Amino acid sequence: MAVDEEKNGRTATATVLVASDDSNNTPSIINGTSDGGKDDVYEVDDADPANLSLLQSIKRFPRVVAYILAACPGILLYGFDMVIVSTLTAMPEFQHDFGEVHRGKPIIPSGWLGIWTAAPSLGNIAGAAVAGWVCDRFGRRMSLMLGAVISAVAIAVCFASAFSADIEVRRGIFLLGKLMEGFAAGQVVCTVQIYTSEIVTRALRGSSQALLPMMTMTGQLIGALVVFACLSIKGRRGYLIAVASQWAFSALLFGIAIFIPESPPHLIRVGQIDAARKAQRRLHRKEVDTDKMVDKISEILEQERETMKRLGSQVRFIDCFRGVDLRRTIIVLVCHMMPQNFGLGLLSNASYFAQTVGIKPYVSVLLLEVGIAVGLLANIISVWTLSVAKRRPLMLWTLSFTGVAWAAMGISGCFDSPVTKWWTAASMIIIIFVCGNGVWPASVLATAETSSLRLRGRTQAVGWAVHGVYACIFAVVLPFIYNTDKGNLGAKTGFVFLALCIFSLGLIWWLVPEMGGRSAAELDLLFEHKVPTRDFLKWSVEKSNLKPSTTPAAGAGVSVSAAPAVVGEDEKKKSSEHVEVVTQ
């Protein structure tokens, strides 16, 4: 329904909120028109972008898809870095050069294993924190290029560590390299998520964010395959080849960062409107009304700026923890906890963990490869799953099943049987498939779509920093739980993750709402009016806590309203009255 009112020779600006009792049809908040739920930012014809199928979306926005895929080497680098410590420590030659003999077998001491495993996460914390500032100050492309350069230097440090004569020096230099590489990976993956969330259309939002776990698993698979291929190489040359292979990702990422267009929302935020229009045109085909898209993004950002001016605040990290944005930040942080809570840290270290339950080194690396391949398959399926399924139920159901699988593994560890090690291996493969097609990509999507556009860079930086802290805690603690020279829990470690799954179910149930199909403007309105978590899906104007005064009109309720969530100041000045129309 379009509402145009001629009054004294000029057109009044109307905000139209269409309410429906159907929980699947959410109201649209637009300027001057009602489109039944469409988002003006991505609208070029009468089809609703939010309701397009995955294939239709790819056909309609092929360039957006191409640029999202082009940014993926940054995630590959992150995934490779995540798995490289666990796979290197499973190599006998690496254990010989960096470990010690315990009960006649070479092992990596729990202390060093813990700190090496934690090093990438520690680096992620600093890298993510810096990414938010670099992205806002110098742009998303510059942040990617800087991360690629730091990564290349870090790989060189890890490579050089093998040539020291003193084992403690070798361990220390390797630690420094992993810290630096973790910094680069944290900066890069945070930047990639910011970039893709800003250029993607609403119809592709779920599928695009599912690429993060999928490409993470791909990076892990590449790392595991490289190490597996190097197992038969004698001497240090085997693991040095594995380390050096990471340079390929750094070089590829640097080249791609030069080529891709800058994020239009970032350019608009820093006042480069003409550059934003050029970047937006590169993201879409000629028939797409990119100027309309840029105008809509500008409008949303301006409205957010006006809101914060009234609160007397500028864009700072502290703003993420104030007012309405506090709730949004908490949701982002909770979702960043999910990967460690369902067991990703242990699954990433499966090649070493499997050896503690009696599986031989060669088979343990093969197990890791199978697990990663299964997880990758699940992540590929999740690209479709997130385009059709609701996020919140998907997280709850897959977490519940995962808890049962961890419990079964823990129970098997209570019995001294040859079956235990194979049951443990099977349980881990089942868990990564279930989570890879459920809670993992769904939680990643929630971290990307929850924050406001204005604070997206800062909120993502805070989220990835907490992600790194949390992963670091698990990296340090887990070896003391399962390693043979400490806790020696083995398969009974499953009980630990059963408890974490139950804890996560509670967090999601109480805190994480269903945000599927909502535009940035709609999410702003939902959070601004403090809609309860479990009411997001069924929210409508009639059930909201907006209290406008009403004036009867033929066939509709008409009310004079205060400034709406997405109407810019310039539009409000064009009209002597602001009309809010609600169909009954």
Language-model features and meaning:
Residues 2-281, 305-584:
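Alpha-helical transmembrane bundle of multi-pass membrane proteins
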Residues 290-305:
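Short, well-structured alpha-helical segments
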